[in-house]
Amino acid sequence: MAMSLEVFEKLEAKVQQAIDTITLLQMEIEELKEKNNSLAQDVQSAQHQREELERENNHLKEQQSGWQDRLQALLGRMEEV
C-alpha cells in the first residue's frame, strides 16, 4: 500500500510538473504571438512608407524632367539670339 502511495505521489508530481511546463509554454506562445503581430504591423507600416516614398520620388522625377525640358527650351532660345 505504501509503495503504491509513493508511486502515486511521484506520478502526481510529474503531472504537476508537466502542467507547469505546459502553462509556461502557453505563456511563451502568447508572448511570441504578440511579438509576431507587432512585427507584422511594423512590416506593414514600412511597406506603406516605402510606397509613399516611391510616389514622392516619381513626382520629383517628373518635376525634374519638366524643369530640364524648360531649361533646354530656354537654352535653345538663348542660342537663337
Curated annotation (Swiss-Prot):
What cellular-component terms does GO give this entry? cytoplasm
Write the record's keywords in alphabetical order, separated by commas. Answer: Cell cycle, Cell division, Coiled coil, Cytoplasm, Septation
Which regions are flagged for Polar residues bias?
38-47
Signal peptide stretch: none
| Chain intervals with Basic and acidic residues compositional bias | 48-62
Q: Name one GO biological process term.
A: division septum assembly
Q: Where is this region: Disordered?
A: 38-67
From which residue to which does any coiled coil extend?
A: 6-80
Record bears the keyword Electron transport: no
The record ties this protein, via InterPro entries, to:
Cell_div_ZapB
Q: Where in the cell is it found?
A: Cytoplasm
Tell me the function of this protein.
Answer: Non-essential, abundant cell division factor that is required for proper Z-ring formation. It is recruited early to the divisome by direct interaction with FtsZ, stimulating Z-ring assembly and thereby promoting cell division earlier in the cell cycle. Its recruitment to the Z-ring requires functional FtsA or ZipA.
Name the family the entry cites: Belongs to the ZapB family.
Name recorded for this polypeptide: Cell division protein ZapB
Origin species, per record, is Citrobacter koseri (strain ATCC BAA-895 / CDC 4225-83 / SGSC4696)
